[in-house]
Amino acid sequence: MLFVTYAGCFGIELFVHGVAASYYVDRFGLDLRGAGLAVGGFGLLALFARAMGGMASDRLARRHGLASRARLLCALMFCEGIGLLWFSSAQGVAMAVTAMLAFGMCLHMACGATYALVPFVDRKALGGVAGIIGAGGNVGAVAAGFLQKYIGSVQHTFTVLGGFVIAGSLCALAVRFSREHVTSEERRYQEALQQNWLLQSRELSTDSTGRSST
């Protein structure tokens, strides 16, 4: 399921980087410099939005449990799909750029939220799981490219991709964890908190001992 969700976020990102500049030139009459700046803003979102997706997933998991990670991913991908539909129907440059930045924010956060789930799928095969999910991004980009060739219109391709992403967001809800898995992860989390508390206590006691000796 995470293979599909990553195809719907990172795969779309790769596709957008490949066609968005020419889309702005052909549809809105922008020059290459303006189109490049618009697409560059989309790419710059990755500098912080991915981390935001991962951190939001961590915070929700601390408050509402492991299943909330999957629900967050579903919500981000759903908003991404809505943003793609908005982008494809935009009639002006300003509206198109706004829509692209909006769905781009959700897209990059979805990438981070996807990989926030990776360690909890199978700890014994963490590298394999990460590799398979990562491959989903490349498959998604290739599939989007073939879809664009089949449809012929980039604008209509974005519309169809928006629908696919909305449908793909349901795959995030299909990510389930057994009760034993949730209990095990909760125990690991509590043990990590306890170890962190003990480490901080030792550091404080060491500092106080050093100050008293001086």
Q: How would you describe each model-predicted region?
A:
Residues 177-214:
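Intrinsic disorder in cytosolic terminal tails and internal cytosolic loops
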Residues 75-91:
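C-terminal ends and interior cores of transmembrane alpha-helices
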Residues 59-77:
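Cytoplasmic membrane-interface "Motif A"-like loop-to-helix N-cap segments
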Residues 156-175:
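Symmetry-related core transmembrane helices of the 12-TM Major Facilitator Superfamily/SLC fold
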Residues 1-54, 111:
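Extracytoplasmic gate region of multi-pass secondary transporters
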Residues 94-111:
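Hydrophobic core of transmembrane alpha-helices in multi-pass small-molecule transporters
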Residues 122-152:
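A late C-terminal transmembrane helix in Major Facilitator Superfamily
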Residues 109-122:
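Intracellular juxtamembrane helix-capping segments at the cytosolic ends
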